């Protein structure tokens, strides 16, 4: 009797054989599974983003609680018309360079360039902000003010960033002749200061990050995604041996000065009139102490020391016609006396020898005379940064002491190793005297043979003194002048 074989219930690989599915159904199931996984991933990323945001908020609150107050600031206002008094374009640029140097020497935080001529009395063509790319304001400004502001910004910018922010322009034609500011934030490549100025690069980075050029060999990966071309201040993180990339954190431009006390340059602002100096202040509370300079003001030597207690101080300088002319050309100001606009109206050089003092000269004189009168509410912290921010050594002006000592020791070693040189320590008669070179004949003395050779012949001319000539005078007609033909 034949036996019937049972149908197989499993495949050769051990998997149960189920009902047959079409490829359409299989693809639908795969798409649904893929969609579910993608949705779970998005939910997980959203949850992580919320957690990171909450942690960042807590960290920001903690940092804000620990942050130090910003130090007190010093601002100066200079008229743009001072460039019109220069006789050439080179002198215009040089005057702007003098103002920039004075601002950096006395640690000025803001430079305001204002128009003291006014729109009604301006004779040359105005250029709008939109046409020059300086902003979106509809106001106008004189070309001299624009040139002064542009040169001031150019000199303040670190050298490795100028090509990103300053294209070729006729106002900067002679900027290469100007003296460099050499401020602390103009760092060299070998400087190891933890703060650096940089620009965001157009370079692909991971999400939430971007690359910044801070003047090093390689770009720095910063912690925020910002559009390219923006100037930023980067706090450098200590580089670990395991990480190849240099990382940094974007911070406020005020943080380097607040944390280390180092001077971090100045900001430049343009004011269309004298009134805009006060009304468009970048500080929320405005300027609490204002000082005007004029030869009609109070003697600066009569002002007590440390009497100007300020948080945001402003010093205004006049042009060729003084502050009185700037006040008369401003239509928004109704006062006639400029002394009413300022808290203090001083004469920084009472006994001047010249009838006029140029604005770039008055700037140095005033800032030097007012140094003992200022009392900032929040002073800069004092930290020794000599090793991190070398002054003249970093710019190549002077040589460090260790370099001088090493060169001196090297030279001394070379002298000691010279075999021909003898050094006498003490006078001693027992030691043999050094050999003396034999005396040679005087090379300048004429021998008898040379004198015989030098005896003039009959056809030669001889120059003799007037004492050897006889008293009889000879006329030119009696002499034979044929030899001159």
Curated annotation (Swiss-Prot):
Keywords: Methyltransferase, Nucleus, rRNA processing, S-adenosyl-L-methionine, Transferase. Its EC number is 2.1.1.-. S-adenosyl-L-methionine binds at residues 296, 318, 347. GO terms for biological process: rRNA modification. Its main location: nucleus. It is found in: Nucleus. Disulfide bonds: none annotated. Pfam families: Methyltrn_RNA_3 (PF02598). One of its GO terms (cellular component) is nucleolus. InterPro entries: Alpha/beta_knot_MTases, NA-bd_OB-fold, Put_MeTrfase-C9orf114-like, tRNA_m1G_MTases_N. It comes from the Eukaryota. It catalyses: uridine in 28S rRNA + S-adenosyl-L-methionine = N(3)-methyluridine in 28S rRNA + S-adenosyl-L-homocysteine + H(+). Belongs to the class IV-like SAM-binding methyltransferase superfamily. This is 28S rRNA (uridine-N(3))-methyltransferase. The lineage of its organism: Eukaryota, Metazoa, Ecdysozoa, Arthropoda, Hexapoda.
């Amino acid at each position: 009797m034949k036996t019937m074989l049972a149908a197989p219930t499993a495949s050769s690989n051990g998997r149960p054989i189920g009902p047959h599915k079409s490829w359409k159904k299989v693809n639908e199931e795969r798409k649904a599974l893929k969609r579910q996984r993608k949705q779970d991933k998005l939910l997980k990323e959203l949850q992580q983003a919320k957690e990171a945001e909450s942690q960042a908020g807590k960290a920001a609150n903690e940092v804000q609680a620990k942050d130090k107050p910003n130090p007190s600031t010093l601002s100066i206002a200079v008229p743009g018309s001072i460039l019109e008094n220069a006789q050439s374009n080179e002198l215009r640029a040089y005057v702007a360079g003098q103002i920039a140097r004075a601002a950096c020497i006395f640690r000025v935080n803001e430079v305001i360039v204002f128009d003291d001529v006014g729109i009604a009395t301006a004779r040359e063509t105005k250029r709008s902000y939109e046409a020059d790319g300086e902003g979106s304001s509809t106001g106008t400004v004189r070309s001299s003010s624009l040139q002064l502001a542009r040169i001031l910004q150019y000199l303040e910018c670190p050298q490795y960033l100028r090509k990103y922010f300053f294209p070729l322009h006729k106002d900067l034609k002679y900027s290469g002749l100007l003296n460099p500011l050499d401020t602390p934030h103009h760092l060299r490549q070998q400087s190891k200061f933890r703060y650096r100025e940089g620009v965001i690069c157009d370079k692909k980075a991971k999400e939430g990050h971007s690359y910044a050029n801070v003047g090093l060999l390689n770009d720095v990966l910063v912690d925020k995604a910002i559009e390219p071309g923006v100037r930023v201040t980067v706090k450098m993180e200590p580089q670990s041996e395991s990480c190849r990339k240099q990382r940094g954190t974007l911070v406020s431009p005020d943080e380097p000065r607040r944390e280390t006390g180092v001077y971090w340059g100045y900001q430049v602002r343009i004011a269309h009139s004298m009134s805009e100096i006060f009304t468009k202040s970048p500080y929320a509370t405005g300027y609490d102490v204002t000082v005007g300079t004029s030869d009609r003001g109070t003697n600066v030597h009569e002002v007590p020391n440390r009497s100007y207690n300020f948080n945001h101080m402003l010093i205004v300088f006049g042009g060729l016609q003084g502050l009185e002319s700037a006040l008369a050309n401003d239509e928004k100001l109704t006062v006639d006396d400029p002394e009413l606009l300022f808290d203090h109206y001083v004469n920084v050089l009472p006994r001047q020898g010249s009838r006029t003092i140029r604005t770039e000269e008055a700037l140095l004189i005033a800032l030097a005379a007012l140094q003992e009168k200022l009392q900032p509410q929040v002073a800069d912290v004092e930290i020794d940064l000599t090793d991190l921010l070398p002054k003249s050594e970093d710019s190549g002006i002077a040589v460090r002491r260790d370099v001088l000592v090493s060169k001196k020791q090297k030279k001394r070693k070379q002298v000691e190793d010279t075999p021909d040189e003898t050094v006498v320590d003490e006078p001693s008669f027992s030691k043999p005297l050094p050999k003396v070179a034999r005396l040679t004949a005087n090379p300048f003395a004429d021998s008898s043979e040379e004198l015989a050779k030098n005896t003039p012949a009959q056809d030669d001319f001889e120059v003799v003194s007037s004492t050897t000539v006889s008293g009889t005078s000879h006329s030119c007609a009696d002499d034979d002048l044929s030899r001159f033909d």
